[in-house]
Each structure stands twice: as structure tokens, then as C-alpha cells.
């Protein structure tokens, strides 16, 4: 991890030491909020399950991008150095199906969707992962891992297929809070199944269809649940245990449960100390699904309302709660973001017209309040309240006839730091001499009640983003 940690700048180590600040997270494994204790002091290793790249990302896929990017930013604000890895599943039956339907190769499908996914990530102002492994580039390690499980008798081979023996590990079902007997009752029993147990899952699938590889058992491809275990091991330099494993609530079972089972079987570790899951996205109170015809692509929503507004909307609810998206929620997000950015813009303009440098000092107490909310299991609703409180104070300073620019700078810089932790884009307005002259002409026209000319100047100022 060293190279990433050396490269990465972080906001301020001040907060990690002052008053014993620490992060608290809801751990899905223990079902309670726990104090975060890193494996390596001052460092965070985090893996987030990425997409299966067969179709454009919808807004449900976009929510974890924002949630875990915000978690990373919060750790950085607390002084930690973070390595975040997020994969691409570029081997899957769905990818093969799309490739056949479109008459193109699987690689052409996956490259197109990976680009779209990264475009959406950047539009949401999310940092790129420190590593983004692909299944196709990890195949030798995947085959070696499956072979290890077979040799340890945690997996078995039937006619070229390889299955994981769930009964060989203890505590299966703990992450999803399910008992194995209950899972057995609900398991689908196929009379033609080659499995010893209905809960056993595929590690290697024998097939001649689509993209495939040679293996000791057959020509085929790996099962989904195996891929992430191997990529974690590879990307974190052979460490079988990382700090945080994240993903959507829908991945808890069976995907994450099966990852844990394999890791315990191979390495006697549970992959991660903290399991973090974000809630699902609903549309007008209904689950998003193709059958209901209410799937919204992330790129369409970004084009409609902008990446900043969508990010703000995602963060307006606690990350573990379901998020209901409708027109009312979108309008609220727009208004709230405008409520924050408008006084910032006014402050930049007034400071620029006065020739004042707002410097770097910020309202430490206000930022402390904000950070206290963020380190409490990413309590973004409380963090928003802290922002609105500072914005209220900023508005009061901006409206003064004789502006206290020291106070203005403290409030502006505090809000900027808060937005940076949330990943909300903000650019300071720097006025040129031409801008200042245009502003003076507008004020003069207003004073002389030449409203036609004033409207002309005002339109130009709005176009420049000054008003």
C-alpha cells in the first residue's frame, strides 16, 4: 500500500489528533456502530464492489459511487491516508448475451460500459479508485485460488464444474443475519443439480460459450463470488484482511456472504473488519426495475439536474436508508444547493470588488461541528444542518453595509472545506478588471435609473457567473 499512501495528500492531520477524534461506522457484521480501528495506524484499506459492465449504470449504481467516495473524503479529512479499490466484473453471462445481440465482442461491450461508468463517476465529482482491477486481467490468480480451495477440500469438482462446499466453513450466514437451516429451507432444489448441497455455489463453470479460459478442471470461466476475493488479495499486496469492504445492500447475500466463506476457507480471515452497505434507491416509492419500466440511467439524471445536484440528493439521506427519488426530492436538492452556493458567490464578488484576499483561515468550530456529524457513521443530514448554520451566518456578513472581510473569509473557507469533504464542486470567482468595470457600470446604470442599460449589464454579469 505504501506508494498510494505516500502519493496521497490529505486535508488536515489536525483533526485526527485533537480531542481524540475517531470515525464510527455501522458494521453489518456486528449489526452495530463501532469505533473504527485501522489495521495500520493512520491508514485505511477499502474495497468497494464495482459493476458488472453489461449495461449503462443506473442511479442505483451511482449511489455507492457517491457514498464510498464521501467515506474516503471523510477519512482524508480526519488525517488518514486511504487506498480504495473498486473492480469491474467484465466476465458474465449477461455480457456474453449483449455481445451476441449486438454482434460485437465481449471486450467491446465492457470497454464501452467502463468508459460510461467512469464518465458518470467524474460527472459526480468522485475521485477515481486507486486501483480498478478487471476479472479478465486476474484470471491466473483466480484459477490458482480455486485450486487452493479444491486442495483444502473446501471445493469439489463435478464434470468440469467446481463448487464451494458451504458446509466446510462455520458461521455461514452471519453477515446477512441468517441461519444456515433457514437458508436450506428456502433453497431451490434442482433434481438435476450436481451439487452436494443446494447452498453450494459455483467457483468455476464449464462452458464452450463466450469468453473462456483453460483450467485444471475444464475450459470455462469463474463464478462471480470468487473474483472479488482474489482481486482484494492481489491489489492489497497479498494482505488477506483489509479494513473496509463496501457495496450496496443487495450484495450482502449471497455475494458478500460467499466472499467471506471463501476467504475463511483459504486464509482463515473474513476479508474485512468492517462491512459497510448503502441503502437502495426507489423511484416514486417503488423499487427500480425493468419490469416496472422505471429504471433511470445515471447519465440521463446527470444531464437533467447536474452532477452536483444528484450528489447532493444522494447525500441528503443517511447512506444506510433507502433513498426515494421523485420530482419533489429533486427540487429540494436544487433549492438547498442554491441556498449554499449563492452566498458563496456573493462573498467572492464582494471580496473581489474590494480587492480583498480571503486567505485560508476558517471557522474551526463550525467545521468541527460538521466533521463530528460526518465521523458519526457519515451522518450527512446532521452535516447538512451544520452547513446551513454557517451559511446563515455567511448571509448575515455578506449583507452588512461595511463588510467584515475577516469574518467573511472564516465563514467562506469553512463552507468550502465542508463542500470539499462532501465532494460538491465549488469554484471561486476571480474578478478581472473588465468584470469589475462591468459591475461598476451596472451599479451606475441602476443608480441613474437607466433600467434598460442596467438589464443589459446584469445579463452580461449573469452570463459570466458573477450575479
Which role does the model predict for each range below?
Residues 80, 154, 466:
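Short phosphate-binding/catalytic loops that engage adenosine nucleotides
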Residues 30-35, 39-125:
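N-terminal, positively charged nucleic-acid-binding surface of large information/translation enzymes
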Residues 1-5:
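Short, small-residue-biased leader/transition segments that mark boundaries at the very start
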Residues 119-147, 151-153:
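N-terminal, positively charged, Ser/Thr/Ala/Gly-biased leader segments
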Residues 23-54, 69, 140-350:
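Alpha-helical recognition segments enriched in aromatics with Gly/Pro capping
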Residues 287-288, 296-467:
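Structural preference for alpha-helix termini/caps and helix-kink/transition segments
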Residues 11-13:
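Short hydrophobic alpha-helical segments enriched in small aliphatic residues
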Amino acid at each position: 500500500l505504501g506508494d498510494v499512501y505516500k502519493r496521497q495528500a490529505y486535508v488536515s492531520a489536525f483533526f485526527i489528533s485533537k480531542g481524540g477524534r475517531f470515525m464510527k461506522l455501522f458494521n453489518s457484521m456486528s449489526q452495530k456502530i463501532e469505533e473504527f480501528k485501522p489495521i495500520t495506524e493512520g491508514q485505511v484499506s477499502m474495497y468497494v464492489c464495482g459493476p458488472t459492465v453489461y449495461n449503462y449504470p443506473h442511479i442505483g449504481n451511482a449511489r455507492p459511487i457517491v457514498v464510498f467516495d464521501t467515506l474516503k473524503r471523510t477519512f482524508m479529512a480526519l488525517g488518514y491516508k486511504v487506498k480504495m479499490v473498486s473492480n469491474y466484473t467484465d466476465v458474465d453471462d449477461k455480457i456474453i448475451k449483449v455481445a451476441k445481440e449486438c454482434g460485437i465482442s465481449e471486450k467491446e461491450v465492457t470497454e464501452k460500459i467502463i468508459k460510461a461508468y467512469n464518465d458518470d463517476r467524474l460527472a459526480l465529482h468522485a475521485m477515481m479508485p486507486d486501483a480498478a482491477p478487471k476479472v479478465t486481467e486476474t484470471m491466473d490468480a483466480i484459477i490458482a485460488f480455486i485450486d487452493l480451495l479444491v486442495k483444502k477440500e473446501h471445493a469439489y469438482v463435478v464434470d468440469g464444474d467446481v463448487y464451494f462446499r458451504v458446509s466446510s466453513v462455520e458461521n455461514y450466514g452471519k453477515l446477512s443475519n441468517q441461519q444456515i437451516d433457514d437458508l436450506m429451507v428456502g433453497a431451490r432444489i434442482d433434481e438435476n443439480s450436481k451439487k452436494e448441497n443446494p447452498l453450494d455455489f459455483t467457483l468455476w463453470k464449464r462452458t464452450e460459450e463466450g469468453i473462456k479460459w483453460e483450467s485444471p478442471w475444464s475450459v470455462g470461466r469463474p463464478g462471480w463470488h470468487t473474483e472479488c476475493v482474489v482481486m482484494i488479495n492481489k491489489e492489497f499486496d497479498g494482505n488477506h484482511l483489509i479494513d473496509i469492504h463496501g457495496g450496496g445492500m443487495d450484495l450482502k447475500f449471497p455475494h458478500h456472504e460467499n466472499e467471506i466463506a471463501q476467504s475463511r476457507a483459504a486464509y482463515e480471515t473474513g476479508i474485512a473488519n468492517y462491512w459497510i452497505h448503502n441503502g437502495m434507491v426507489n423511484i416514486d416509492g417503488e423499487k427500480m426495475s425493468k419490469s416496472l419500466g422505471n429504471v433511470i440511467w445515471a447519465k440521463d439524471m446527470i444531464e437533467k439536474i447536474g452532477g452536483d445536484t444528484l450528489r447532493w440528493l444522494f447525500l441528503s439521506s443517511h447512506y444506510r436508508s433507502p433513498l426515494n427519488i421523485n420530482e419533489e426530492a429533486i427540487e429540494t436538492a436544487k433549492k438547498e444547493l442554491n441556498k449554499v452556493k449563492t452566498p458563496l458567490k456573493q462573498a467572492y464578488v464582494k471580496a473581489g470588488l474590494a480587492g480583498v484576499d480571503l486567505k485560508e483561515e476558517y471557522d474551526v468550530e463550525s467545521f468541527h461541528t460538521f466533521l463530528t456529524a460526518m465521523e458519526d457513521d457519515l451522518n450527512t443530514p446532521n452535516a447538512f444542518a451544520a452547513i446551513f448554520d454557517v451559511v446563515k451566518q455567511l448571509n448575515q456578513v455578506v449583507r452588512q453595509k461595511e463588510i467584515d472581510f475577516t469574518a467573511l473569509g472564516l465563514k467562506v473557507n469553512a463552507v468550502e472545506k465542508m463542500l470539499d469533504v462532501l465532494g460538491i464542486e465549488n469554484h471561486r470567482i476571480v474578478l478581472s478588471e473588465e468584470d469589475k468595470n462591468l459591475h461598476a457600470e451596472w451599479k451606475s446604470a441602476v443608480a441613474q435609473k437607466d433600467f434598460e442599460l442596467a438589464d443589459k449589464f446584469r445579463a452580461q454579469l449573469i452570463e459570466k457567473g458573477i450575479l
